[in-house]
Amino acid sequence: MALTAEQKKEILGTYGLHDTDTGSPEAQVALLTKRIADLTEHLKVHKHDHHSRRGLLLLVGRRRRLLKYVAQIDVERYRSLVERLGLRR
């Protein structure tokens, strides 16, 4: 299921650099992480939904590239983001 506007606003308020921030890597990674978590739960129930599995893999790849970018720009921002999101890295 897609993220609701309220969920997006809450996530962007927590991880964005300011209230209307949608473009910073931190905000994008946080939104992708929520979508990945939702898709993971969906796939636990619907094991044979291969179209959604491919979408999940694409989202994970996009998040990985954004995290790599943040790590290249500022390692401390990267470490803080990974810790706040609870990612294994």
Swiss-Prot record:
GO cellular component, one term: cytosolic small ribosomal subunit
Gene Ontology annotations of biological process type: translation
Protein name per its UniProtKB record: Small ribosomal subunit protein uS15
GO MF: rRNA binding; structural constituent of ribosome
CDD domains: Ribosomal_S15p_S13e
Domain of life: Bacteria
Keywords, ordered alphabetically: Ribonucleoprotein, Ribosomal protein, RNA-binding, rRNA-binding
Keyword Cell inner membrane listed: no
PROSITE patterns referenced in this protein's UniProt entry, alphabetically: RIBOSOMAL_S15
Presence of keyword Transmembrane: no
Record's function text: One of the primary rRNA binding proteins, it binds directly to 16S rRNA where it helps nucleate assembly of the platform of the 30S subunit by binding and bridging several RNA helices of the 16S rRNA. Forms an intersubunit bridge (bridge B4) with the 23S rRNA of the 50S subunit in the ribosome.
Recorded family membership: Belongs to the universal ribosomal protein uS15 family.
Source organism of this protein record: Mycolicibacterium paratuberculosis (strain ATCC BAA-968 / K-10)
Subunit structure: Part of the 30S ribosomal subunit. Forms a bridge to the 50S subunit in the 70S ribosome, contacting the 23S rRNA.
